[in-house]
């Protein structure tokens, strides 16, 4: 893949009133991206912690490599996560292709699912060798399929096992090992179980944790319902930061804008993780993240980002990808802007058709730029 074909800072900003030149930029137009590619991988832990001030949640079927590439165009700084990859798939199934990613995605973390310490340690080693900046253990997913493998949110019931898993992974890799968890499951009292859980994993060497501020119900609720029905309890996450000041703690759950994220940072949390809002309205979240959350650079323009996606799409299609596998992540780029509906319609109706290529994306973009011009 030709490096540096994406727009970040260091290129000319395009104002909302101008048409974007839809071009595939050469490397020399994107010095910031070139520097990012040439930076050492994995990144130092302090750099990853800074990136974790705002992160995009790992989301099954959504945060694949194409999604992450798009998100990196929108924010130079935010920490990105893979979809959950199961340790058995890597260790027993040999599915190392699941670790494929582009160098432009960094900083990027690999989320693992599993409950066997030795197997997780080996999977973590594969992830570190692949160049991921962080290995994250999933202790929050409530789906039946995940529970059947004895991992995900059900691990909230086994803090000692989680600690053993963390210790085994840390012994195997040099990159930071982190945990994503809930505040509890089923009838557990979060005030009782969450401090014990954090104490155990901290003793095992975990220094950074992301807490989804809801309980998970392992029976009776679907994964989607578990994201909405259990009530949010932000206060307990802030309480855990006060009780465990040595831990880097990020909050996840229900945060739908940067305006909602900022108060949590101002109250003392180390980071905020945003999920569905970052996927469905990526421009509203990620294009503004660098100046508002990190105090760096300026907002990125989604029209220009589309132009710079064209080279990536060409490269990926030459390697066998289909257009819709990439453009499905781009549907929300112009949410709330004139032309957004037609942008989505052109891509949704045409991207799966035989012969569809970047010309369709250019046609879709005209639905936006033609109105904005």
Predicted segments — roles?
Residues 28-50, 54-60, 167, 172-174, ...:
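Alpha/beta catalytic cores of nucleotide-metabolism and tRNA/nucleoside-modifying enzymes
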Residues 34-44, 59-133:
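Glycine-rich, positively charged N-terminal anion/phosphate-binding segment
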Residues 56, 71, 83, 110, ...:
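Conserved, mostly hydrophobic/aromatic
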Residues 82, 134-143, 204-215, 274-277:
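Non-cysteine beta-strand/loop elements that form the S-adenosyl-L-methionine
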Residues 86, 114, 141-143, 183-187, ...:
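Active-site-proximal loop/turn and secondary-structure-junction residues that shape catalytic pockets
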Residues 107-178, 186-190:
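Active-site beta->alpha loop and helix N-cap motifs at the rims of alpha/beta catalytic domains
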Residues 144-161, 191-192, 220-232, 293-296:
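Glycine-rich tight-turn/loop motif centered on a GG-T
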């Amino acid at each position: 893949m030709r490096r540096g074909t994406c727009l970040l800072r260091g290129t000319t900003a395009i104002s909302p009133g101008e048409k974007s030149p839809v071009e595939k930029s050469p490397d020399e137009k994107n010095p910031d991206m070139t520097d990012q590619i040439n930076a050492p991988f994995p990144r130092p832990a302090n750099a990853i912690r800074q990136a974790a001030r705002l992160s995009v949640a790992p989301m099954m079927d959504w945060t694949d490599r194409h999604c992450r590439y798009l998100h990196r165009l929108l924010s130079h700084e935010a920490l990105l996560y893979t979809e959950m990859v199961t340790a058995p798939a890597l260790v027993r199934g040999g599915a190392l292709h699941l670790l494929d990613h582009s160098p432009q995605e960094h900083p990027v973390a690999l989320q693992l699912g599993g409950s066997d310490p030795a197997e997780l340690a080996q999977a973590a080693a594969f992830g570190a060798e692949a160049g991921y900046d962080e290995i994250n253990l999933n202790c929050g997913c409530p789906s039946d399929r995940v529970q059947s493998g004895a991992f995900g949110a059900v691990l909230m019931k086994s803090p000692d096992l989680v600690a053993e898993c963390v210790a085994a992974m840390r012994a195997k890799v040099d990159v930071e090992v982190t945990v994503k968890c809930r505040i509890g499951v089923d009838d557990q009292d979060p005030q009782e179980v969450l401090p014990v859980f954090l104490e155990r994993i901290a003793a095992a060497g975990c220094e950074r944790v992301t807490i989804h501020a809801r309980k998970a119900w392992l029976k009776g609720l679907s994964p989607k319902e578990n994201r909405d029905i259990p009530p949010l309890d932000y206060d307990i996450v802030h309480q855990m930061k006060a009780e465990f000041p040595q831990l880097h703690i990020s909050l996840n759950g229900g945060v739908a804008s940067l305006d909602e994220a900022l108060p949590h940072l101002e109250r003392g949390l180390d980071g905020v993780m945003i999920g569905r809002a970052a996927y469905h309205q990526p421009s509203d979240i990620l294009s503004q993240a660098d100046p508002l959350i990190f105090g760096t650079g300026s907002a990125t323009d989604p029209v220009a980002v589309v132009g710079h996606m064209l080279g990536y799409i060409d490269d990926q299609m030459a390697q066998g990808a289909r257009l819709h596998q990439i453009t499905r992540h781009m549907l929300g780029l112009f949410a709330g802007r004139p032309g957004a509906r037609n942008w989505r319609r052109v891509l949704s109706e045409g991207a799966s058709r035989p012969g569809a290529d970047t010309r369709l994306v250019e046609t879709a973009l005209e639905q936006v730029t033609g109105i904005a011009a």
